[in-house]
Amino acid sequence: ATYTLPEPPYDYAAL
């Protein structure tokens, strides 16, 4: 993902 999110698996939510 290309957004600043918490640790994975949240990275997939950064669509």
From Swiss-Prot:
Residue ranges of the TM segments: none
Catalytic activity, as annotated: 2 superoxide + 2 H(+) = H2O2 + O2
GO molecular function, a single term: metal ion binding
Cofactor, how bound (note): Binds 1 Fe(2+) or Zn(2+) ion per subunit.
Record has ATP-binding as a keyword: no
EC number: 1.15.1.1
UniProt keyword annotations, A-Z: Iron, Metal-binding, Oxidoreductase, Zinc
Requisite cofactors: Fe(2+); Zn(2+)
UniProt subunit comment: Tetramer.
Function comment: Destroys superoxide anion radicals which are normally produced within the cells and which are toxic to biological systems.
Sequence similarity: Belongs to the iron/manganese superoxide dismutase family.
Record's protein name: Superoxide dismutase [Fe-Zn]
Organism expressing this protein natively: Streptomyces griseus
Gene: sod2
